[in-house]
Amino acid sequence: MRSPLLAPSEKCQAWPRFTPPWYLSSGLAMTLYTAFVANQRCLNSARTREPEYISQVMTGSQGVPLHVWRSPIPSQAKGTLIATYGITGSLEDQGFLRQWGRWAYERHYDVILFDWRAHGKTAELSPTLTSDGLYEGEDFVYLAAQAKALGYPGPFWFGGYSLGGQLSLWGVYKGQTLADWGNNDAMLTSFSPTDIGGAMAICPSLDSQRSLNYLTSHPVGRYLEKAIANKLKELAWQLHRHHPGEFDSQAIERANTIWGFDHNLVIDRLGLASVEDYYEVSSALPLLSKIVKPTLLLYAADDPMFHPAIVEELPGLQNQLTGVDLQITPKGGHVGYIANGPCQQASNDPDENWAIHRTLDWLDQKSLA
């Protein structure tokens, strides 16, 4: 009998079962393999088949410049995917995002990928730091409005994975509440919530406080946290070089953990008193019951980055979810979902990236509805 934890959402058809290679059967192994092997493989594959993106600077909320890659507009496009990545990285090095965009384009969706705040080339353009969705959610809406003005067809779908998944959840929420915050901005006057189709979030961060406490309480988790913190510190020094005088070098020196990065560099700029307050107000978990647009949330029960209690609680929220299609798999790791050969064949997928093809199947289903 199927476990209730793994029951498919009633809002979405049951998916083919995900099965990894035997050597990636643990969430930690899958996560490390994805970071050190699969990402580069995705990048190599995407470079040969992705659309010829046009690099452009668009405008986000608060006038923040955002670096984007936008695809040529294909004939008979089904809609437009606007997507970004996780806590660290850039458009140049995110293989999973590039493959997602490549396969979406092959399925006749327009694609806009972007470096979110304080990342990639966006970090060269602006000293504005991250807000974990509070303003990035609005950024998605601003990008969609500008894409519409350029001739990109709706509906507009917001996508992300890991922390980017949290951002996409904020994006769809901000999109459906546009009237509450748009303030008659001229850039948004020809855009409305009806232009937005929904969102897709793969292994999103839902409760940063609990997950960070969980990570730092285990030896392996501390290793993962330290690796991310080192990347964040590199990011801070890059911002310091690009924008002299904007950042206190001593504050950057003190930012030796994820919590330290947010404490020393982020919360004051957002007017928040503590990191705990920041994580509470930016958490995506309370948003799930408020989202009414079709939104896919794909989550692996063995994701080593998140507190295991979260995945145990999610099925209990089903009755509160009006727009969210919750899909929980027993395996998959953190943004891994590398399928073995039989799994790939059973799903008739063109490559091993199971999550990419399931999300696009879901998108096709919603586009036909």
Curated annotation (Swiss-Prot):
Residue numbers annotated as active site: S162 (charge relay system), D303 (charge relay system), H334 (charge relay system)
Q: Write the Enzyme Commission number(s) for this entry.
A: 3.1.1.-
Q: Tell me the GO molecular function terms.
A: monoacylglycerol lipase activity; short-chain carboxylesterase activity
Which superkingdom, per the lineage? Bacteria
Q: Which SUPFAM superfamilies match?
A: alpha/beta-Hydrolases (SSF53474)
Output the PROSITE patterns linked to this UniProt entry.
UPF0017 (PS01133)
InterPro entries from the UniProt entry: AB_hydrolase_1 (IPR000073), AB_hydrolase_4_CS (IPR000952), AB_hydrolase_4_sf (IPR050960), AB_hydrolase_fold (IPR029058), ABHD4 (IPR012020)
Q: Which Pfam families match?
A: Abhydrolase_6 (PF12697)
Keywords attached to this Swiss-Prot or TrEMBL record, sorted alphabetically, are: Hydrolase, Serine esterase
| Gene Ontology biological process terms, A to Z | lipid metabolic process
Q: Which family does it belong to?
A: Belongs to the AB hydrolase superfamily. AB hydrolase 4 family.
Protein name per its UniProtKB record: Putative esterase slr0264
